[in-house]
């Protein structure tokens, strides 16, 4: 990762900037395949300032932000306590969101955020990490597979009226050096 990129744990004061960045990153990822009204509803529900503020207070959720100077270049959101049946371990955390700004991709930011998630999972005694990723997002699926994740199932993801099929992916921490 570039020397001018830094990471920080998010806190309540970050709700507004996380809301704006999450909305921007979601539109970058899904804007050309989703209806504008569906994106608007989804971003208000899951990236609205009030929603993010509540999540930043929740004990089972944590965000880590990657900054380039004073701008958010990406973030990872970790959720504890949810594991689908397809995941081969009960003691797993979920990477619920990992986004890197489209203009910042290729700089190692995603890998650094993933390394942070792996370290957090290990520190907290988990045996693995799971996530879901849109099946047509070859760039994201390729990133996760290169990191060591493997596909263990599928799930439907709804973004308003738009339906997407996601891969459920699993990473055993014993497989990561």
Placement of each model-derived feature along the sequence:
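Acetyl-CoA-dependent GNAT
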Residues: 7-15, 19-32, 37-103, 111-116, ...
